[in-house]
Structure formats: C-alpha cells, structure tokens
C-alpha cells in the first residue's frame, strides 16, 4: 500500500506542475515527529499544504490528529490546508479542511461532501483568471 500511495502522490505532483504550481513531495511525511503534509506546492499567489488520499470508494475518514497536524503546518508555513482525494476513474478533488465533515471524533468526506470538492484549476485560480480575461 505504501508504494501505491507514493505513486498517487507522484501523479498528483505531475498534475500540480501542469496547473502552474511548483510542488514537492515531503519525504517521510507520515513518520516525521513534526507536522508534515504529503505535498507542498505554490504558484506565487497560492500556497498549499496537501494531505494526499486515495480510496476505492467513499467515505474517506481522517483522524482529528491528522487534520490538526495539517492545519498546524499550513498556518506555520503560510499555506492553505487541503486534502486531495483520488477515486478510481475520477479527477483529483481538493477539499479545504473547512469543507471536511466533522464526525463525533474525526472528519470525513462522504457522498454529500465529495461533489463540493474543487478541481485543480479552481485551486490554482485559473477558473477565476480566465473568466475575467487575465492570462495565466
């Protein structure tokens, strides 16, 4: 499973670069004693701390600690905290942590939250810029 997760992180890196972000994987992000996202990306206007997840189906559950560490890193780095989720045969969807649904002890992305996720172009701001004629 670890190699599959790494492959998805690398796939997302390619998509981020195509969308105009400089992006890197954070090696050992899951085992660091410090808060560490899976990917850090930026395009000069927007900076992202991303926790990468892939699932065969919904819901996706995230521990409160995992979300808290992502938010802690993002605040310290000056980035926006996102969870990027990949489902089979679907595009990457990005969820700002504020969009995650709170459960009794944790967080989740389920069928009601998933359609609200952002596409990579929306996160990059291209949708807004193209709409108003600004070149990207």
From Swiss-Prot:
Family label: Belongs to the Holliday junction resolvase Hjc family.
Q: What does this protein do?
A: A structure-specific endonuclease that resolves Holliday junction (HJ) intermediates during genetic recombination. Cleaves 4-way DNA junctions introducing paired nicks in opposing strands, leaving a 5'-terminal phosphate and a 3'-terminal hydroxyl group that are subsequently ligated to produce recombinant products.
Keyword field contains DNA damage: yes
Spell out the SUPFAM superfamilies in the cross-references: Restriction endonuclease-like
Top EC category: hydrolase
Describe the protein's quaternary organization and the partners it interacts with: Homodimer.
Cofactor (UniProt):
Mg(2+)
Q: Which reaction does it catalyse?
A: Endonucleolytic cleavage at a junction such as a reciprocal single-stranded crossover between two homologous DNA duplexes (Holliday junction)
Identify the domain of life: Archaea
Record-level Gene Ontology MF annotations: crossover junction DNA endonuclease activity; DNA binding; magnesium ion binding
Q: Where is the active site?
A: 29
Q: Which gene encodes it?
A: hjc
Site residues (Transition state stabilizer), renumbered to this chain: 53
Q: What is this protein called?
A: Crossover junction endodeoxyribonuclease Hjc
EC number(s) from the headed UniProt entry: 3.1.21.10
Cite the HAMAP family for this sequence: HJ_Resolv_Hjc
């Amino acid at each position: 499973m670890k190699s599959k997760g790494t492959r998805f992180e690398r796939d997302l890196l390619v998509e981020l670069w195509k969308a105009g972000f400089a992006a890197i994987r954070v090696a050992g992000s899951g085992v660091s004693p410090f808060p560490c996202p899976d990917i850090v990306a930026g395009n000069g206007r927007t900076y992202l701390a991303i926790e990468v997840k892939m699932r065969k189906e919904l819901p996706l559950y995230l521990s409160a600690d995992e979300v808290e560490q992502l938010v802690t890193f993002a605040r310290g780095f000056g980035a926006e905290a996102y969870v990027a989720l990949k489902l089979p045969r679907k595009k990457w969807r990005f969820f700002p942590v504020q969009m995650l649904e709170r459960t009794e002890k944790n967080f989740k992305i389920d069928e009601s939250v998933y359609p609200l996720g952002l596409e990579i172009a929306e996160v990059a701001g291209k949708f807004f810029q193209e709409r108003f004629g600004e070149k990207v």
